[in-house]
Swiss-Prot record:
<dbReference type="Pfam" id="PF00679">
    <property type="entry name" value="EFG_C"/>
</dbReference>
<feature type="binding site">
    <location>
        <begin position="88"/>
        <end position="92"/>
    </location>
    <ligand>
        <name>GTP</name>
    </ligand>
</feature>
<dbReference type="Pfam" id="PF14492">
    <property type="entry name" value="EFG_III"/>
</dbReference>
<dbReference type="Pfam" id="PF00009">
    <property type="entry name" value="GTP_EFTU"/>
</dbReference>
<keyword id="KW-0342">GTP-binding</keyword>
<comment type="similarity">
    <text>Belongs to the TRAFAC class translation factor GTPase superfamily. Classic translation factor GTPase family. EF-G/EF-2 subfamily.</text>
</comment>
<dbReference type="GO" id="GO:0005525">
    <property type="term" value="F:GTP binding"/>
</dbReference>
<feature type="binding site">
    <location>
        <begin position="17"/>
        <end position="24"/>
    </location>
    <ligand>
        <name>GTP</name>
    </ligand>
</feature>
<dbReference type="InterPro" id="IPR005517">
    <property type="entry name" value="Transl_elong_EFG/EF2_IV"/>
</dbReference>
<dbReference type="GO" id="GO:0003924">
    <property type="term" value="F:GTPase activity"/>
</dbReference>
<dbReference type="GO" id="GO:0032790">
    <property type="term" value="P:ribosome disassembly"/>
</dbReference>
<dbReference type="GO" id="GO:0005737">
    <property type="term" value="C:cytoplasm"/>
</dbReference>
<dbReference type="InterPro" id="IPR009000">
    <property type="entry name" value="Transl_B-barrel_sf"/>
</dbReference>
<dbReference type="InterPro" id="IPR000640">
    <property type="entry name" value="EFG_V-like"/>
</dbReference>
<dbReference type="InterPro" id="IPR004161">
    <property type="entry name" value="EFTu-like_2"/>
</dbReference>
<dbReference type="InterPro" id="IPR031157">
    <property type="entry name" value="G_TR_CS"/>
</dbReference>
<dbReference type="InterPro" id="IPR035649">
    <property type="entry name" value="EFG_V"/>
</dbReference>
């Protein structure tokens, strides 16, 4: 089947923003203008097309990034048809995993900011993630019709808070109630949208006289920014020659793709103004799959050997599975991004991570929650597959004859746990199936059984994260569950080195006995280094075949530390000496010896309890700053700074132990009459104060 749209006209873009900056509304408008939706879905009345899970529609926030395909020929129909694959990403901090995984498969992003709120805390997290994956981006300042809207203040914040390099390509005409449209700095014309046609019709007019000087000033800045793309353009510019429109667009495009600048636009998605111009900017400035470097991976058998795949239909097939969803009609859907080659439904693909071949069932192109079955997917496209049983998020799918392992995604460790049990015993098995399905979809969600209590423990990125998963269990799987109080994911480590500690497991009472003897040195590692085992046995005092057993004995002991049974992290064990018995030694005896030596060494190495510390940012009206700061301090928080918000008010940044943050949203609401909001994300582990550690140990009964 021939390609309908050349790959140069593909744009794989994400739309991401702080919660409530109007991102889903912006996406809705895009779907409307690109002709996919005939009636605009409003988030206000819970009808938005992209927010397709029931909880999202109730809460008015986006949780799962739905992928949608749309087509655009330009605002005035003056471009050849381009194909947009749009990924809507959530703005709530408990779902950063969703943002992270969509960033990985995008080629460009539109960052939506609120003209009143400006650069809010979550915007900084998203910006950092986009930097990490080197995603070229545009900035769109939304809600220009709101009281307190200020485009230029947001411009300043992008520079100071995000260290961004925004280049406005439009400036607003009016603001708040008086917001009418924008001045297009490329055309040097005013664009006024027709409200009766929901912004489908528009006209170019002369720039209002009172804005001429502002428009000239910002056009000059834009042209200067374009001239910096090459020496040749700079010479032309400094020589007083005019740069052509095509030269400016190409230069800004090159610099955007190199992540040197971010073209900046504005509008009000709700009032249907400005989104259309942003879509043109996506064509003008954001990359197609061929404008970015080829994807790289490694050889299946030799992880040092680097391979690359170009975005070309004739290359060998390679794709990345970036999301799993359970669909009520077709079962498990795996969303994947094709980096090279093409694939037909019914073809066999190879998953080098799982070392399994699988046959691809149906292939679906998604439009929010509607789907269209297609026969083949080409390089640069995003689609969903039915029938892959073994693939999970982050796996590579490739041509069985040309294996490649694309870089895996790194998922954060959960910081909060809760016990969960079904309301009726009959639902126990159903709950197990539901939880495993949800864990397959979301790698930052874990399920385990507590060996001591037999309880099912779920872990995730925050209270809201777990609340929504329990809610989904009820809606999608019909399992109602009770959840216990949130538990903090503490860790244990050591502060000193313990040398020459021995573990001896001996059972000799007639017949075949048991004999294992290991001597270890245990030392602390720097935070985040994890566990390391070094074999320093000389002269065969422990035979080679028993050394892995000693390591296994230690590794099996790591999940349950000696202080309060929490996982032990950041320690290094060196096996230095030991002895064996010709007849009585076996693997089991050495496993026991390793475990005994490790526990004894932990006792001698000054064990300490670590607690998760959270980066907390509170947005509050100025009147409440004292109250909020006092409250954070009472929660053992350390206030690290304060910023001004665009529309007045303050952002307070603090580091607070997670254990002190339970129920914070309720107390913040009552302390500020519901006018303050906060976000929180995991920062690092720190040693818990003695009184806290003792309380935790007492609660664990150790």
């Amino acid at each position: 089947m021939a390609r309908k749209t050349p790959i140069e006209r593909y744009r794989n873009i994400g739309i991401s923003a702080h919660i409530d900056a109007g991102k889903t509304t912006t996406t809705e408008r895009i779907l409307f203008y690109t002709g996919v939706n005939h009636k605009i879905g409003e988030v206000h009345d819970g009808a938005a097309t992209m927010d397709w899970m029931e909880q999202e529609q109730e809460r008015g926030i986006t949780i799962t990034s739905a992928a949608t395909t749309a087509f655009w020929k330009g605002m005035g129909g003056n471009y050849p048809e381009h194909r947009f694959n749009i990924i809507d990403t959530p703005g709530h901090v408990d779902f950063t995993i969703e943002v992270e995984r969509s960033m990985r498969v995008l080629d460009g992003a539109c960052m939506v900011y609120c003209a009143v709120g400006g650069v809010q805390p979550q915007s900084e997290t998203v910006w950092r993630q986009a930097n990490k994956y080197k995603v070229p981006r545009l900035a769109f300042v939304n809600k220009m019709d709101r009281t307190g809207a200020n485009f230029f203040k947001v411009y300043d914040q992008l520079k100071t808070r995000l260290k961004a390099n925004p280049v406005p390509v439009v400036v607003p005409i009016g603001a708040e109630d008086g917001f009418q449209g924008v001045v297009d700095l490329l055309e040097m014309k005013a664009i006024i949208w027709d409200e009766a046609s929901q912004g489908v019709k528009f006209e170019y007019q002369d720039i209002p006289a009172e804005l001429q000087a502002t428009a000239d000033e910002w056009r000059e800045k834009m042209v200067e920014s374009a001239a910096e793309a090459s020496e040749e353009l700079m010479e032309k510019y400094l020589g007083g020659e005019e740069l052509t429109r095509a030269e400016i667009v190409k230069a800004l495009r090159d610099r955007t793709i190199a992540c040197e600048i971010q073209p900046m636009l504005c509008g009000t998605a709700f009032k249907n103004k400005g989104v259309q111009r942003m879509l043109d900017a996506v064509i003008d400035f954001l990359p197609s799959p061929v404008d970015i470097p080829p994807v790289t991976g490694t050889d299946e058998d030799d992880s040092e050997k680097k391979l690359e795949r170009k975005a070309d239909d004739t290359e060998k097939f390679s794709a990345l599975a970036f999301k799993i969803m359970t669909d009520p009609f077709v079962g498990q859907l795996i969303f994947f991004r094709v980096y090279s080659g093409k694939i037909n439904s019914g073809d066999t693909v190879y998953n080098p991570v799982k070392q399994k071949k699988e046959r691809l069932g149906r292939i679906l192109q998604m439009h929010a929650n509607q789907r269209e079955e297609i026969k083949e997917v080409l390089a640069g496209d995003i689609a969903a597959a039915v029938g892959l049983k073994d693939a999970t998020t982050g796996d590579t799918l490739c041509d069985p004859a040309a294996p490649i392992v694309l870089e895996r995604m790194i998922f954060p460790e959960p910081v909060i746990s809760q016990a969960v049990e079904p309301k009726t015993k009959a639902d126990q098995e159903k709950m197990g199936i539901a939880l495993n399905r949800l864990a397959a979809e979301d790698p930052s969600f874990r399920v385990r059984t507590d060996e001591e209590s037999g309880q099912t423990i779920i872990s995730g990125m925050g209270e809201l994260h777990l609340e929504i998963l329990v809610d989904r269990m009820k809606r999608e799987f019909g399992v109602e569950a009770n959840i216990g109080a949130p538990q903090v994911a503490y860790r244990e480590t050591i502060r000193k080195t313990a040398e020459g500690v021995e573990g001896k497991f001996v059972k000799q009472s007639g017949g075949r006995g048991q004999y294992g003897h290991a001597v270890i040195t245990l030392e602390p590692q720097e935070p985040g280094k994890g566990f390391e085992f070094i074999d320093a046995i000389k002269g065969g005092v422990i035979p080679r075949e028993y050394i892995p057993a000693v390591e296994k004995g230690i590794v099996d002991t790591l999940p349950s530390g000696i202080l309060a049974g929490f996982p032990v992290v950041d320690v290094k064990v060196t096996l230095t000496f030991g002895s064996y018995h010709d007849v009585d030694s076996n693997e089991n005896a050495f496993r026991m010896a390793g475990s005994m030596a490790f526990k004894e060494a932990m006792r001698k190495a000054s064990p300490v309890l670590l607690e998760p510390m959270m980066a907390v940012e509170v947005e509050t009206p100025e009147d409440y700053t004292g109250t909020v700061m006092g409250d954070l301090s009472s929660r053992r928080g350390i206030v690290q700074g304060m910023d001004d918000m665009v529309g007045g008010g303050k952002i307070i940044k603090a580091e607070v132990p997670l254990s002190e943050m339970f129920g914070y949203s309720t107390s913040l609401r009552s302390a500020t009459q519901g006018r303050a909001t906060y976000t929180m994300e995991f920062k690092h582990y720190a040693e818990a104060p003695k009184n806290i550690a003792e309380a935790v140990m007492a609660a664990k009964g150790k």
